[in-house]
Curated annotation (Swiss-Prot):
It is found in: Cytoplasm. The keyword Cytoplasm applies. SMART domains: tRNA_SAD. It comes from the Eukaryota. The lineage of its organism: Eukaryota, Metazoa, Chordata, Craniata, Vertebrata. Functions in trans to edit the amino acid moiety from incorrectly charged tRNA(Ala). One of its GO terms (molecular function) is nucleic acid binding. Its cofactor is Zn(2+). Pfam families: tRNA_SAD (PF07973). Keywords: Cytoplasm, Metal-binding, Phosphoprotein, Protein biosynthesis, Zinc. InterPro entries: Ala-tRNA-synth_IIc_core (IPR018165), Alanyl-tRNA_Editing_Enzymes (IPR051335), Thr/Ala-tRNA-synth_IIc_edit (IPR018163), Transl_B-barrel_sf (IPR009000), tRNA_SAD (IPR012947). Zn(2+) binds at H109, H113, C209, H213. The gene is AARSD1. This is Alanyl-tRNA editing protein Aarsd1. GO terms for biological process: alanyl-tRNA aminoacylation; regulation of translational fidelity.
Length: 412
């Protein structure tokens, strides 16, 4: 059985009757990215204008009597609509589809059929699967690689067919119809019942499909192939946008271009060269900065070594610096008799720490210092270093070390 959304992909609302409404749960992804379970109801209607997930196409969103439908799934010949409000069986309801989402899916799905057919016709490249993503779609082709010329030829051909305004129609064939054997497709679901649905692009392609499609290729507006990516099992993913997604992509790209023009103070044609120059300048500055930091670390190490306060616990904190900076100081000092506690980072945030000195003392104190600074670390051979999330507790860590030294001195 075909749902109303399949018989008329352009229908935006539909009046029907509630068949059943049962308590159900839906696993979904929350705003924090974690899985959460929603309690609600599984509503079955006599027919529906909301497409249930299938054929590589995501399900529709919409409303039933202004009640939001959060998921639509197919179960045999019926569609289950998940809502968080119950509906009375036997009642008449108005079902409305989220048209922006639906039309986007129609453009991407029909675009996939067209690209698949053209890739096969031009280069005998077979489609093994496809994915309709939130921002872009991918067609997996049974080839280890594609040339830029092949990609360009496919893009040119599909857009020519869009300009030719070729009609797209849907037919239903019985399972025993001889024509079924001549139709492309990757098979039917195990629970499929009823006639076979065939989507035909006039003179281009005829394919088994359960999805919603445009009625004419002109509704695709344009297809842009963004390129290829390496796929699984020695295959290639062809990345594409169709219809309104191309316009949105162009709008984002133009916005980025304008922003870069203002930042780089040059025309779009010079952006790449300007960024390369900035990268080269940054590398030189980073190298010079590293050399200066190393010289500073050596100077600091010698100053600490010759300080009248040398002995017990030697403490140094700097806002600027990195792990290498601290290790240079520790290497230059090279003492296993004195505890050296070095920290770098913002006192109001996180940073890095290093504890060096007598191996037994460092082994004991390292994890405790990490705990005080609410960080993590590891070490061996008289050196323990790691990341701290609370550099504001640095004074507590210093007190811990000084207490330890005082206790050790008292024992001696």
């Amino acid at each position: 059985m075909a749902f109303w959304c399949q018989r008329d992909s352009y229908a935006r609302e539909f009046t029907t009757t509630v068949v059943s409404c049962c308590p159900a749960e839906l696993q979904t992804e929350g705003s924090n990215g974690k899985k959460e379970v929603l309690s609600g109801f599984q509503v079955v209607l006599e027919d529906t204008v909301l497409f249930p997930e299938g054929g590589g196409q995501p399900d529709d969103r919409g409303t039933i009597n202004d009640i939001s439908v959060l998921r639509v799934t197919r179960r045999g010949e019926q569609a289950d609509h998940f809502t968080q409000t119950p509906l009375d069986p036997g009642s008449q309801v108005l079902v409305r589809v989220d048209w922006e989402r639906r039309f986007d899916h129609m453009q991407q799905h029909s675009g996939q059929h067209l690209i698949t057919a053209v890739a096969d016709h031009l280069f005998k490249l077979k489609t093994t699967s496809w994915e309709l993503g939130r921002f872009r779609s991918a067609i997996e082709l049974d080839t280890p690689s594609m040339t830029a010329e092949q990609v360009a030829a496919i893009e040119q051909s599909v857009n020519e067919k869009i300009r030719d305004r070729l009609p797209v129609n849907v037919r239903e064939l019985s399972l025993d119809d001889p024509e079924v054997e001549q139709v492309s497709g990757r098979g039917l679901p195990d629970d499929h019942a009823g006639p076979i649905r065939v989507v035909n692009i006039e003179g281009v392609d005829s394919n088994m499909c359960c999805g919603t499609h445009v009625s004419n290729l002109s509704d695709l507006q344009v297809i842009k192939i963004l390129g290829t990516e390496k796929g699984k099992k020695n295959r290639t993913n062809l990345i594409f946008l169709s219809g309104n997604r191309v316009l949105k992509w162009m709008e984002r790209s133009h916005g980025t271009e304008k922003a870069l023009t203002a930042l780089l103070k040059c025309g779009a044609e010079d952006h790449v060269e300007a960024v390369k120059k900035l990268q080269n300048s940054t590398k030189i500055l980073q190298k010079n900065n590293l050399n200066l930091l190393r010289d500073l670390a050596v100077h600091i190490a010698h100053s600490l070594r010759n300080s009248p306060d040398w002995g017990g616990v030697v403490i140094l904190h700097r806002k600027e610096g990195d792990s290498e900076f601290m290790n240079i100081i520790a290497n230059e000092i090279g003492s296993e008799e004195t505890l050296l506690f070095l920290t770098v980072g913002d006192e109001k945030g996180g940073g890095l720490f290093l504890l060096a000195g007598p191996p037994a003392s460092v082994e004991t104190l390292g994890p405790r210092v990490a705990e005080v600074l609410e960080g993590k670390g590891a070490g061996k051979k008289g050196r323990f270093q790691g990341k701290a999330t609370k550099m504001s507790r640095r004074m507590e860590a210093q007190a811990l070390l000084q207490d330890y030294i005082s206790t050790q001195s008292a024992k001696e």
